[in-house]
Regions:
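Residue-level detector of flexible, active-site-proximal loop/helix-junction positions
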Residues: 120, 136, 332
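Beta-strand signatures of extracellular beta-sandwich domains
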Residues: 112-114, 324
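Short loop/turn segments immediately following beta-strands, especially the blade-tip
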Residues: 116-122
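Residue-level marker of positions within ordered structural domains that often coincide
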Residues: 2-5, 78, 118, 260
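C-terminal outer-membrane/trafficking sorting elements
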Residues: 295-334
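Low-complexity, Pro/Thr/Ser/Gly/Ala-rich linker/spacer regions in secreted
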Residues: 2, 6-11, 286-304
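A domain-level signal for the mature, folded cores of soluble proteins
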Residues: 10-111, 128, 133-292
Length: 334
């Protein structure tokens, strides 16, 4: 026990680990972060982690619709109940010019956000996922159970795709980015499933000139509003299950983000969610005393003081209190 206590560290508010990174094809894929022919899913997850963990501030591109990243913190992010719980940083901006003064627009490339609680206590993102119901969740224009398959082209060509609704198209190449747009470490066919939001881009150019404004959705999506606004903040209480019913989670351990729109904006190219970091907005908040309403076991320190420390051991989150150690689901370890 003395050895374990000697290595305890203060938790970081920032994203600490990337578990999976699989972008859809796009003009920044294989560049943000850089991929080589020898890379694997594991090495690319590590590269993505190096780019955005602990507030590193670099950029990870998710590519066209469906491309995703799964990340976590070095501690559970607690559901505050009535406040924003975490933020996801991207590179969205507001334009100083737009024809629609009733809403914000500029460079908004929204990504759908899902969260997961480590119910089995193994430190891996293999439990149920719950979507955070953003402003477009109930929109009749949102397509559920959508699927797209991208196929690797021969050589440096546009990347073709087909969907499960009879649609098809390409992720087009452009003169600005000359690398391969299809993930080098991926199989020759990539299929993604999820929900697709309505296109948010409007061409407001005049006299034959193109000028695309990508309008922001109200709330609940990554890379949708600039980082200094509340629009990049999220509440765990927005979580819903696969039937759209609210899911009361005491905390979350993992976050998944995927590009939510399938559109191409002329010379700008495909719309692609970018991630530059994530932050717990209340990292010192104690775990709730009684999460029993979620179906999870009450914590062993219910109705007492919060634990003295939280650590990660062999991929598993532990809670230490006195000389006892527990998993986050209440299993006594010693």
């Amino acid at each position: 026990m003395a050895l374990i206590l000697s290595i305890l560290l203060t938790v970081s508010p920032y994203l600490a680990r990337v578990y999976e990174y699989m972008p859809a094809p796009g003009q920044f894929v294989n560049a943000l972060p850089v991929a080589t022919a020898g890379d694997t899913p594991q090495t690319m997850a590590a590269k993505a982690e190096a780019a955005i963990a602990y507030n590193a501030g670099k950029t990870v591109c998710l590519g066209a619709w469906g491309g995703y990243i799964v990340f976590g913190f070095d501690h559970p992010v607690v559901n505050s109940g009535d406040e924003y719980d975490f933020r996801i940083k991207g590179n969205a901006t507001y334009a100083s010019y737009s024809q629609d003064a009733t809403r914000k627009g500029g460079a908004s490339e929204p990504g759908i956000v899902l969260v997961s609680y480590d119910a089995n206590g193994n430190g891996l993102p293999d439990d149920a996922w719950y979507e955070l119901a953003g402003s477009e969740y109930s929109s009749p224009q949102t397509i559920r159970h959508y699927a797209v398959t991208y196929t690797r082209p021969n050589g440096l060509q546009d990347v073709p795709w087909t969907d499960n609704r009879g649609g098809n198209g390409v992720v087009p190449r452009n003169e600005f980015h000359q690398q391969d747009y299809f993930p080098l470490w991926a199989p020759d066919e990539l299929t993604f499933t999820g929900s697709r939001l309505a296109p948010n881009a409007v061409d407001e150019g005049e006299n034959g000139e193109h000028s695309f404004i990508l309008y922001c959705y109200d709330y609940g999506y990554a890379d949708n509003h600039p980082n200094k606004t509340d629009g990049c903040k999220f509440c765990i209480r927005w979580a819903v299950d696969q039937n759209g019913l609210p899911k009361d989670l005491p905390a979350i351990h993992f976050v998944k983000v995927y590009t939510a729109v399938q559109q191409v904006c002329g010379w700008i190219g495909e719309t692609s969610t970018e991630i530059t970091g994530a932050e717990d907005l209340h990292p010192d908040m104690p775990f709730p005393d009684d999460p029993s309403e979620t179906g999870l076991s009450p914590m062993p320190y219910a109705n007492s003081q919060p634990p003295t420390a939280k650590i990660l051991r062999d991929g598993q989150f532990l809670i230490l209190r006195g000389e006892k150690a527990y998993t986050l689901t209440g299993q006594t370890l010693w």
